[in-house]
Amino acid sequence: MLYHASQTGNIRVLEPKVSNHNAPLIYFSAKRENVLVYLSNAVEKYCKETEFAHNGKWHKWASYGFEPDGILRLDEYYPNAIKDTYKGVSGYIYCSNDIYETESDIKINNVVATSEAVPVVSVEFIEDAYAEILKAEKAGLIKIRRFEDMSDKMLAWIKNTIKSEYTQAENEPDYRYFLKAKFPFLSADC
């Protein structure tokens, strides 16, 4: 079984959408817990909650990686990032099988990508993505590296990375708005 997350309900057939890889694709994971991170986008959620006017495509924010053993690790780049991003967010996990993998060069652990429409076999409603993420953490299925547990070296890396991201986001007002709100050091430096 392969899993795909969406905030959109009542999908019978998953259709490819233009992705971060600049091609129409649908991404699936062989691990249900790994798709939980796609139930919310921190940039979009924050901008909507604060009534930031934006007409274009929302910048995708994803601060996760994988442990050497293949377990997904969520990283909090700012205090309470995971709670802010996922608490109160509902969505759906769609299950499919018999997927024809058309993109084999996607370098994300346990991910299968296809450019073809895929029928949905079953669906699970997730009432609160944050609660579900914490449940997966407790079960040892994912790891969370909380902001307050970050090393000084990691905090310095985050600061440098965010400054670079801000500079490169010249044409992404939604992303810059989000970054300035969540990383106060940008206000002093930019």
Across the structure, where does each feature detected by a protein language model lie?
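ADP-ribose/NAD+-binding catalytic cleft of ART/PARP-like enzymes
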Residues: M1-A23, Y38-N41
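Surface-exposed, glycine/proline- and aromatic-rich loop segments on solvent-exposed faces
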Residues: P24-F28
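Short, conserved phosphate/pyrophosphate- and ester-handling motifs at nucleotide-, phospho-/glycolipid
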Residues: K31
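Conserved NAD+-utilizing ADP-ribose enzyme module
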Residues: A42-C190
